[in-house]
Amino acid sequence: MSAEIEYIRNVFRSGFELTDITWSSWDEPGRIGVEHHVLWAPDAEQGEDSVGLLLRFPPTAHGDFHEHTGYELMLVLDGQLDHSDGVSYFKGDLVVEGPGTEHRMSSSSGCTVLAIRTKPAEARTPSKPIREVTPAA
């Protein structure tokens, strides 16, 4: 098996300008409007659980509410990423969440994110209402 190299120029462009890569709808319960480009996927044969993704959130799109069984790193490449705890992250912000953290990510205005998970996440039901962020007028 030969090693693969994927090269994406100027990844800090808006995901909606990144037309040189293939985006797929991320269709899972609780996810609305999120698109992804898989950089690498888990490989059970190699004992590898990690996944690397580019995520594209159009305005008002959101992921599911979930708990992390490993670490998750999110680098906002463009736009505004909104966390269910009410904090918003912007282009250049790096967020690292540890095992046991729970959240639902969304975007009120649209964003592109590099996401790396060391282990899978598990869907959960939130124990308190999720704080929604509304777009600025």
Residue ranges of model-derived segments:
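Structural motif
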Residues: S50-G52, M74, C111
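A short beta-strand-loop-beta hairpin characteristic of the jelly-roll/cupin
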Residues: D64-D93
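Conserved short histidine dyad/triad with adjacent acidic residue
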Residues: D20, H36-H68, V87-S88, G98-E102
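Short intrinsically disordered coil segments
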Residues: L54-L55, G70-E72, K128-P135
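Ligand-binding loop in jelly-roll beta-barrel domains
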Residues: P99-P126
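Preference for bulky hydrophobic residues occupying beta-strand positions
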Residues: L55, L75, A115-I116
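A short, N-terminal "cap"/entry segment at the start of jelly-roll beta-barrel domains
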Residues: M1-E48, I130-A137
